[in-house]
C-alpha cells in the first residue's frame, strides 16, 4: 500500500488555493481541439467538494443564457491550468445542491465580509 501512497503523493498539485462551497471560482481549463490547444475559463460558484487526496473533485455551477451549467473537475487534474478564487461566499452548508432549484435573487450567495483585526 505504501507504493500507491507514494504515487498518489507525486500526483498532487501544490498550487491549489483554499476554497469551499459557496465561493466563486474562475477555473482555467486547457482545451485540446485537434492540434490546437487553448485555455477556456469556467466561472461559477462551488456546489461542493467530494473525496480526498488525488481523487478529490469539486463541482462548479454557473447560469449561461438562462440555462444552468454544472461541471465537475478533479482538483489535481493536469487539464486545469489554474484556479482563481473571485469571491468568498457566506454559506452554512458543505453541499449547496438546493441552489439548483432557486431562481433570480434567491439564487444569490452572500459575500463573506472580512473584518480587520
From Swiss-Prot:
PROSITE patterns: RIBOSOMAL_L19. The keyword Protein biosynthesis does not apply. One of its GO terms (molecular function) is structural constituent of ribosome. One of its GO terms (cellular component) is cytosolic large ribosomal subunit. SUPFAM superfamilies: Translation proteins SH3-like domain (SSF50104). Keywords: Ribonucleoprotein, Ribosomal protein. One of its GO terms (biological process) is translation. Transmembrane segments: none annotated. This protein is located at the 30S-50S ribosomal subunit interface and may play a role in the structure and function of the aminoacyl-tRNA binding site. Belongs to the bacterial ribosomal protein bL19 family. PANTHER family: LARGE RIBOSOMAL SUBUNIT PROTEIN BL19M, RIBOSOMAL PROTEIN L19. This is Large ribosomal subunit protein bL19. It comes from Paenarthrobacter aurescens (strain TC1).
Amino acid at each position: 500500500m505504501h507504493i500507491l501512497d507514494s504515487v498518489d503523493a507525486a500526483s498532487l498539485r501544490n498550487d491549489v488555493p483554499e476554497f469551499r462551497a459557496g465561493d466563486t471560482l474562475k477555473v482555467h481549463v486547457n482545451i485540446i481541439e485537434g492540434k490546437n490547444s487553448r485555455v477556456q475559463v469556467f466561472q461559477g460558484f462551488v456546489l461542493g467538494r467530494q473525496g480526498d487526496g488525488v481523487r478529490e473533485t469539486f463541482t462548479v455551477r454557473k447560469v449561461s443564457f438562462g440555462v444552468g451549467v454544472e461541471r465537475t473537475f478533479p482538483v489535481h487534474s493536469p487539464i486545469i491550468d489554474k484556479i482563481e478564487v473571485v469571491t468568498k461566499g457566506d454559506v452554512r452548508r458543505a453541499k449547496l445542491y438546493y441552489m439548483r432549484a432557486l431562481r433570480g435573487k434567491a439564487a444569490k450567495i452572500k459575500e463573506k465580509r472580512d473584518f480587520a483585526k
